[in-house]
Structure formats: structure tokens, C-alpha cells
Amino acid sequence: MNPVPAQREYFLDSIRAWLMLLGIPFHISLIYSSHTWHVNSAEPSLWLTLFNDFIHSFRMQVFFVISGYFSYMLFLRYPLKKWWKVRVERVGIPMLTAIPLLTLPQFIMLQYVKGKAESWPGLSLYDKYNTLAWELISHLWFLLVLVVMTTLCVWIFKRIRNNLENSDKTNKKFSMVKLSVIFLCLGIGYAVIRRTIFIVYPPILSNGMFNFIVMQTLFYLPFFILGALAFIFPHLKALFTTPSRGCTLAAALAFVAYLLNQRYGSGDAWMYETESVITMVLGLWMVNVVFSFGHRLLNFQSARVTYFVNASLFIYLVHHPLTLFFGAYITPHITSNWLGFLCGLIFVVGIAIILYEIHLRIPLLKFLFSGKPVVKRENDKAPAR
């Protein structure tokens, strides 16, 4: 069994927090992009569309690598059942809390903003269910995927650990070329599966729960397992934390290919399959770019960084309805896209931090939005002398 490192990986904590917080400018820029969303500005901005595409092209791939890294670290720390329980509680409880407190009010607001409240009674039972699946899971989808991955990895991590006990891990060698070929094949495999489903029964691809539980899990699971392997094999981790011009150049070229596919691809043709292949290898190369950058600049501890690491999940959870509120009721009154974008950042981040500070002072909310039980200090229990 691998020993759990005593020193905390500060740069990975920081990267994970920044990737979470990048969801704020991502969704605000989505309002001002050429992509159709719940709410959009009158005229799209080319540069904010480019900025939005850049974040979207790699953010969650890198996030799931870090999640897999820390998940395997905890897998070695706890017994199997306790590990599953702890991991599911820490992502499942915040997700279940956010549905009635955040995404349900958000859904009701959007029904009136988009003028769909009157047509709701006329929808079929399945359409109501599917609409609620998309709208109530909403930006919480990655938490649902983490619950599914954690459950799958009860078996996968056991197999990995058993294989390690029967082999010499020091002889395992990794190269970015080999990994690139593997992830290219994984991307092609995912594209084949999606195209097959599209041919056999296309309506299932528009089913919200199928999309989240099956398709998203299928795409991001290789990154989650890659993170676990990076924890196990120091050579693999060093491969990601060492700057590589090849990875940077390859990522830049892949991003250009991603943009071209967005611009000229067609959803009725091969756009989504092509995107899955591109983003699979782009995500791998961006792990090197982000890890090496973060290892060089973010590998330290500070009170400010710790604050945002702890606050990142809560801020991400509450930012989405705040962003949609801003887009629906404030964006129409700001003529400049860039000014609207900056005002949106100030509005959303400011209110999110205020709400975070309020929730810290309410033990029940603190538990519900973190999944961590409130631990009382021994000093609090000791009688006064």
C-alpha cells in the first residue's frame, strides 16, 4: 500500500480552486458569446466568445485529473466502505442541498424570464421529467458524475491496488507520446460510441440523466483514473509538473482545431464526435500546461489562498443563479459587452463571498454545502476553570 504523503499538495489545491472559480467568468462570458444560452446579450462579443471557448475546452478535464489524484489518496487512507461514504457525502450532500435551494428557484425564474411558464402544463410527463433533469442538475452535473465515478472506482481502485501489489511500480515508465496515443484512441472510442447511439436511438442523447450519468462519466473517467495513476507513480506526476514546449504547442494547435470545429462543424454531421476526439487529447496536454504552471507559481501556503480553496465549491454553487439573474435583469441595461462582463464579475463574486461568509456562521448550512460534519474542538467541550 502506498504511503500518503505528509505534505499537502498546495499547487493542486490551488489549481482545483481556480478551475472551480473559472466557472464564474466562463458563465458570465457565455452571456456575451455567440453561443445560445438561457440569457444572451443583444450583440455577441468575438473576444468573449473566444475566451469562453478557451475555458470550456480544457477546464473540466484538468479538474477531474486532480479529483482522481486526491480521491486515490483518500482511498489509501480509509477502509473501502468509509472511503466511499466520505467521498459520496462530500459531493452528494452539497448537490442535494443545492437543488432545492439554488437550481429549483433558478428554474422557476427562467420559466418566467423565457416566457415558458404558461406552456409548462401542456408538456408531456416525460418532457417535464427531462426538463427538470436538465434544469435541476444544471451546473451541479460534475458532482453527480463524481458520485458515479466514486462508485465505479470502488472496483477500479481495488484492481489497481491489487495489480500494484503483484508488480514493481518503479519499472513503470510513461511518456507523453504514449499517453497521447492512448487518449487519442479513447477519444475515437468515445466518438464511435456516441455515433452508434446517434444512429440506433438518437432521442436518448437528449435525455438529461443519460447525458450526465453515462456520457459525461464515460468521457471524463479516463482523466479521473489518470489522476489516480499520477498519485501512484511519481514519474507520471513529474511528467505533468515539468514544463513541455511540445505539450504547449500541441495544446495550442488542438485549440485552433477546436475553434474550427465550432465554427464550421454541424451538429447533424460529425461536430460532436470530432469535438470529443479533440478535447480528449487537448485535455491531456493541458494537464501538463496547467500543472507545470501551477507547480511553479502556486506551490505555497497562504491564508488568502486557503480561504478561496475552502470557499471555491460554495462560490461555484451559488454563482450560477446569480449569473442568470444578472443576465436576465441587468445585462439588458448595459450596452457595452466588456463593461457588462466586468460588472457581472463584481456582482456575482461580491454577492457569492457575502453569502459564503453568512453560511459559515450557520452550522447547518456549513454542513449542507460542504458535506463535512462540524467538528467541535475539545477546548469547547472543556468546563471553564
Swiss-Prot record:
What are its E.C. numbers?
2.1.-.-
Q: Could you tell me where this protein is found in the cell?
A: Cell membrane
This protein's UniProt keywords? Acyltransferase, Cell membrane, Membrane, Transferase, Transmembrane, Transmembrane helix
Q: Would you tell me the Gene Ontology cellular component terms?
A: plasma membrane
Which membrane topology term applies here? Multi-pass membrane protein
Q: Name one molecular function that GO assigns to this entry.
A: transferase activity, transferring one-carbon groups
The UniProt entry, under PANTHER family, shows:
BLR4337 PROTEIN, GLUCANS BIOSYNTHESIS PROTEIN C
Name it: Glucans biosynthesis protein C
**Gene source species:** Escherichia coli (strain 55989 / EAEC)
Gene, per the UniProt record? mdoC
